[in-house]
Amino acid sequence: MTQRLKTLYQETILPKLQEEFGYKNIHQVPKLTKVTVNRGLGEASQNAKALESSLTELATITGQKPVVTRARKAIAGFKIREGMPVGVMVTLRSERMYAFLDRLINLALPRIRDFRGISPNSFDGRGNYSLGIREQLIFPEIDYDTIDQIRGMDVSIITSAQTDEEGRALLKALGMPFRS
């Protein structure tokens, strides 16, 4: 079954962006490449229970098993040794990416307290967007009673756009609620 957001992109957004930016070839039109969801464990890296809960929460939110990221080198100031788990990460592509973005845009972001839209300034200069989420409770899949601690996560939306303007137009067309 094709995702709702993917169908919307193929049927309406693609022709609109092609006309707006004057592309001759349909493959020049910016599209979503991947979405990465990352959570750094911080001081919880010493705690195996925190790692397990982060793994299950990210798996529940994204629908895909996260990979544990490990420290590349020891840093005494942070009490980290080489090979210690320092975070969890998921890379979403194709159907799961569209499903996650659909839930993020239409369900999770509107549930943030005092939400007025996301910052339009978080583009990286190449059309990719990064978003920080402060608490995992905004996702309807997470049960309030099962979490041990409120933790945030970073969501990076990677597009094939060449400029921030193209990336912003693509995400706005997909329904991303940018602050005016």
Swiss-Prot record:
According to the UniProt record, which cysteines are disulfide-bonded? none
A GO molecular-function descriptor: tRNA binding
The UniProt keywords, alphabetically, are:
Ribonucleoprotein, Ribosomal protein, RNA-binding, rRNA-binding, tRNA-binding
One GO term under biological process is: translation
Looking at the UniProt record for this protein, which Gene Ontology cellular component terms does it annotate, in alphabetical order? cytosolic large ribosomal subunit
Write out the function statement from the record. Answer: This is one of the proteins that bind and probably mediate the attachment of the 5S RNA into the large ribosomal subunit, where it forms part of the central protuberance. In the 70S ribosome it contacts protein S13 of the 30S subunit (bridge B1b), connecting the 2 subunits; this bridge is implicated in subunit movement. Contacts the P site tRNA; the 5S rRNA and some of its associated proteins might help stabilize positioning of ribosome-bound tRNAs.
Q: Write down the PANTHER family for this protein, in alphabetical order.
A: 60S RIBOSOMAL PROTEIN L11-RELATED (PTHR11994)
Listed under subunit, the entry gives: Part of the 50S ribosomal subunit; part of the 5S rRNA/L5/L18/L25 subcomplex. Contacts the 5S rRNA and the P site tRNA. Forms a bridge to the 30S subunit in the 70S ribosome.
The record's comment on protein family reads:
Belongs to the universal ribosomal protein uL5 family.
Question: Know the name of this protein?
Answer: Large ribosomal subunit protein uL5
